[in-house]
Amino acid sequence: MNILKKKVLVGMSGGVDSSVAAYLLKEQGYEVIGATMQIWQDDKEFIEREGGCCSLSAVADARRVANKIGIPFYVMNFKDAFKKNVIDYFVDEYMEGRTPNPCVACNKFIKFSSFLDKAMTLGIDYVATGHYAIIEKQNNRYIVRKSEDDKKDQTYALYNLTQFQLERTLMPCGRYKKSEIREIAKKIGLRVHNKKDSQEICFIPDNDHGKYIKNRFPSKVRQGNFVDKSGNVLGTHKGIVYYTIGQRKGLDIALGKPMYVVDINPFRNEVVLGNLDDLLNTELIAKDVNYIPFDNLKEPMEVEAKIRYSQIPSKAVITPMENDKVKVNFTEKQRAITKGQSVVFYKGDLLIGGGIIE
C-alpha cells in the first residue's frame, strides 16, 4: 500500500496519547490532520472547566502540539450528537436504575461514527485515536488485540467496533507502553509529555453524577425509601440516580452492619440494600452484543469475561440467545453485576466482543 497519499484525521484531546499518535502517524508517512471534537454543551460550564479532555486548555494543548509537529488543526462541532448519544443516554440510564458507561457510548456513537463520517465526507481515508489497543487484519477480517501495556489497555470500551470502522481506524499507541509514549513526547519536545491522565467522566469533572443529574433535572430526582429484600423500609435515600449496584459508601444510613446496594427499583423509587453475599452471582444476560472476529455466535464458547473496566477477566461460557442477546455463565462468583454496564469477552489477548448487562 502506498500510504504517502493516505490521509488520516486524528482525534486530539490535548493529552499525551493522542498527541503522540499524531506524531507517529506522520512519521509513518501519512498525511495527518488534527482535530479536537467540540462536545461541551454550554459556554459558561466549558470556560469554567479546566484540564478535562474537552476543556479550553485541552484545545490549546492540542493546537500547540499540532503546530509543533507541523500538521493542520481544526475544532469540529459534535455538540448535538454528544448530547443525544452520550449525555441524554447517561441521564436516562440512571433514571431507569441502571449504571451507564459513557465512554463506551462515546466510542460507539461519536469517535468511531460521527467523527468517522466527518472524515469520510472530507475525503479522508482513516481516523485515528490515542487508544491503547491493536487492530490487525487476519484472514480478510479485522481483529482487535489487547495493547502492549496491560495496565493501559482500552479494549474494554472498544467492543462495539464494526468491520467497516476497523478498516478505517488506526491506533498507533497500542504497540507501545505508556512510559514509552511519554518518552517519545518528551524527546520531541511536547509540553504534554507529563500531563496527567484524565480519570473522570469528561462532562462531569468532579465525578459526582448524582449532583450533575439533580442540577439539570431537579424535579425528576426525588427522595425515596431504602428497603431490604423483603420490602421493609430501612430509611430514606436522596434519589436513585445517586446509587449504583455494589455501593457501600455514601449511603448515609446506620444499620449496625455493612450494607450494600443490591438492586434499584425505578418504578417504586426504591433502593434495595443487602449484604455482601447478595451481590455475588455467576450468571448474567447481555443485550446489544457485538462480535469482532466473527459476525454471530453460533454455539456456546469458552471465553474470559469481565464486567468492569479495571477487572482481570474471569473464565466464563457465553451462549447465544435470541435478539442479539447472550447468556454469560462465570466459573467463579462475580461481585456486583451491574445493569447498564458492559460485559466484554476475550480469548487470551484477542477481543471477542461484548454487550450491555440487562
Swiss-Prot record:
The active site is at residues 106, 202. GO terms for molecular function: ATP binding; tRNA binding; tRNA-uridine 2-sulfurtransferase activity. One of its GO terms (cellular component) is cytoplasm. It comes from the Bacteria. GO terms for biological process: tRNA wobble position uridine thiolation. Residues 152-154, 308-309 are annotated as: Interaction with tRNA. Its main location: cytoplasm. It catalyses: S-sulfanyl-L-cysteinyl-[protein] + uridine(34) in tRNA + AH2 + ATP = 2-thiouridine(34) in tRNA + L-cysteinyl-[protein] + A + AMP + diphosphate + H(+). Keywords: ATP-binding, Cytoplasm, Disulfide bond, Nucleotide-binding, RNA-binding, Transferase, tRNA processing, tRNA-binding. Pfam families: tRNA_Me_trans, tRNA_Me_trans_C, tRNA_Me_trans_M. Its EC number is 2.8.1.13. Disulfide bonds join 106-202. InterPro entries: MnmA-like (IPR004506), MnmA-like_C (IPR046885), MnmA-like_central (IPR046884), MnmA-like_central_sf (IPR023382), Rossmann-like_a/b/a_fold (IPR014729). The record marks 131, 341 as: Interaction with tRNA. It is found in: Cytoplasm. ATP binds at residues 11-18, 37, 130. Belongs to the MnmA/TRMU family. NCBIfam families: PRK00143.1 (NF001138), trmU (TIGR00420). Catalyzes the 2-thiolation of uridine at the wobble position (U34) of tRNA, leading to the formation of s(2)U34. This is tRNA-specific 2-thiouridylase MnmA 2.
